[in-house]
């Protein structure tokens, strides 16, 4: 599966949606690298 790289700063995730930014567009951590959650498809692919 393709992984999505998290935005440079966490503020970007919050900026997308203020209300449901916690559940849908939240920055996740995976294997040391910061990866965006599966729902956060706006991030760039890695």
Curated annotation (Swiss-Prot):
One of its GO terms (cellular component) is nucleosome. Keywords: Chromosome, Developmental protein, Differentiation, DNA condensation, DNA-binding, Nucleosome core, Nucleus, Spermatogenesis. Testis. It is found in: Nucleus; Chromosome. It comes from the Eukaryota. One of its GO terms (biological process) is sperm DNA condensation. InterPro entries: Protamine_P1 (IPR000221). The keyword Glycoprotein does not apply. GO terms for molecular function: DNA binding. Belongs to the protamine P1 family. Protamines substitute for histones in the chromatin of sperm during the haploid phase of spermatogenesis. They compact sperm DNA into a highly condensed, stable and inactive complex. This is Sperm protamine P1. It comes from Glauconycteris beatrix. The lineage of its organism: Eukaryota, Metazoa, Chordata, Craniata, Vertebrata.
